[in-house]
Amino acid sequence: MPEDSLVWVSGEADQRIVAYRTDGAPAHRELAVPPALGRSAITPNYGFEALGYDRESETFWTVTENALKADGRVAEPGAGHGVYLRLQSFGRDGLPRASYAYPLDMPVSEAKGEQYAFGVVAIWPQEGGRLWVMEREFNVPERRLKARTLMKIYEVVPGSGTALPEKPPSEWLSSYALKKEPVAAFSTRMRLVRPNLANYEGLCEGSRLADGRRTWLLVSDSQGGYGNRLCHLRDWIRVCVSPKVK
């Protein structure tokens, strides 16, 4: 947050959202995560990754990567059902505000590889209360050269939907689902010549070009260089340029 020079970090394992100063020291501030989204409510490795802050409304936004235990089986190859995530907002005071049902796409992969992850990994608030939500499918089969990722970015407008009631049962989520519009989609894959496999997990605003076009940045997590000498993940920053507005 530029207003107070704090860096807010979401913890995928412990479900805490904590503030730090730019020198790395704890700021002793934390968002009040509801028990329904707490550590015991998530499937391991599918907790909070996405975290964004809307400066216009002074609102934090977060969501778990995949479904909560209470909402059924996570979305994965062979699941055969729709999954809805609970998109949660917080005020600048750290207290929870409204939550909304986000409809997660079903995976494209037919089977899980040795390493697999799927779900929402980033949220980027836009002007007018809009949110860009990035979904990522990461699949590494036994044959590493077939490893690939699929990225999809959607736009949702929570203000145009209906907030979830307090403690809604999972079967109600579909009737509250937000409408989402596609923004962009692309894939990366491992290959011997010019490999571009990237585990993108970050999305943020970049610089504005001289002709007025916006840029946005995708940040890849290499998981410490996961893989072997020939086939492994790398840290990437991908620059995307919005179409020129006529």
Can you say where each PLM-predicted feature lies in the sequence?
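Sequence/structural signature of beta-propeller domains
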Residues: 1-246
